[in-house]
Amino acid sequence: MLHRYLPMTEEDKKEMLQTIGVQTIDELFSDIPESVRFKGDLKIKEAKSEPELLKELSQMASKNANLKEYASFLGAGVYDHYAPVIVDHVISRSEFYTAYTPYQPEISQGELQAIFEFQTMICELTGMDVANSSMYDGGTALAEAAMLAAGHTRKKKILVSAAVHPESRAVLETYAKGQNLEVVEIDHKNGVTDLEVLQSEVDDTVACVIVQYPNFFGQVEKLADIEKIVHQQKSLFIVSSNPLSLGALTPPGKFGADVVIGDAQPFGIPTQFGGPHCGYFATTKAFMRKIPGRLVGQTVDSDGKRGFVLTLQAREQHIRRDKATSNICSNQALNALAASVAMTALGKQGVKEMARQNISKAQYAKRQFEAKGFTVTFAGPFFNEFVVDCKRPVKEINDVLIQKNIIGGYDLGRDYKEHENHMLVAVTELRTKEEIDTLVNEMGAIQ
């Protein structure tokens, strides 16, 4: 019987086989040795009806820790933030939902304007001159920034702070290996980049120095001091930054950063089990023609009306092929739109207030932990994350907390041996006083 959604008949199969010059399916796979071919039936359950399937999938999904029912103190690069309701409404519109950055851009003015607004807001937040249409995520944005630096300076050494997100450093290592670049980690001291070590490592072979602001431990790096060291040898200064924090902190561009990158996830993008998210990439005019990804520019048409185009396309793969600045194409256009809508809905004052609440609530949580007898490991200023010495395995604590509908902080021992039994606690604007107090009390009872 012919399936309504699988219309291929035996005649169709026969015609296709004849077209490619074989008689049977077995002959088609004749180059695969008999000894490794699968014989028999796949152990697949019988097909379910749509209602049965929906019920089973719902039961499976119910096992997840839903952030509507759990209080999350887990950050480490992915955060539980408020997303205005309008975000889902806009990105669900059909003209955006299946968006593809066009090669004939004039036909998609709405899509191009949305990307242009994203670029503009990223520039305003970071204090930079130009931003691209988005990257895959913060990790790949960081690696692409390092590749830009290596290509521009023609130097082979990359210095990266050990206080940069471990997963971003891993992505950097992958990119660097293919380009025969050397990656050197700079130790951290008291939760921030060790400036003495950095000073000793920066020389005329260094393409760039990469730091995170706020860094992986939540601490605010001293960008002014780092910039002086970096630019002494004409290396590039790359800063990875949580864009929400820039609603309260001085933008990296004000400290002389050459490239600012990061992940726009805090703006309107759910945690989504770690992705997909949306990287951003901003730089100065000096590197405008070396920036990866797509750039949308504003112009006027023959009637003098405002319009948008994909500009500086000679950098891109559909023109330069293997000599392109990157192979990024449509990438995260939909998530970039979500970030744009969220930032627009919040407005400048809303972003500042959201950042202020992160700082205020994180400071309250820190004081509560200290009052309960916990040691907060680093004393420096921080944004919305800080490190707590738990004196026992973090996994054991989190296993207990999850039973109380609390998602505990990140286990730093996974990435830093010296910080075994230390928890990275994230406190966003969504956390209430009651939730913070419950977390501290539950952890105090486990001690």
Swiss-Prot record:
Q: Which GO terms describe its molecular function?
A: glycine dehydrogenase (decarboxylating) activity
> Pfam family of this protein, just one?
GDC-P
Cytoplasm found in the keyword field: no
Q: Which GO terms describe its biological process?
A: glycine decarboxylation via glycine cleavage system; nucleoside metabolic process
Q: Write out the function statement from the record.
A: The glycine cleavage system catalyzes the degradation of glycine. The P protein binds the alpha-amino group of glycine through its pyridoxal phosphate cofactor; CO(2) is released and the remaining methylamine moiety is then transferred to the lipoamide cofactor of the H protein.
Oligomeric state and interaction partners are given as: The glycine cleavage system is composed of four proteins: P, T, L and H. In this organism, the P 'protein' is a heterodimer of two subunits.
Task: State the name under which the record lists this protein.
Answer: Probable glycine dehydrogenase (decarboxylating) subunit 1
Name of the coding gene: gcvPA
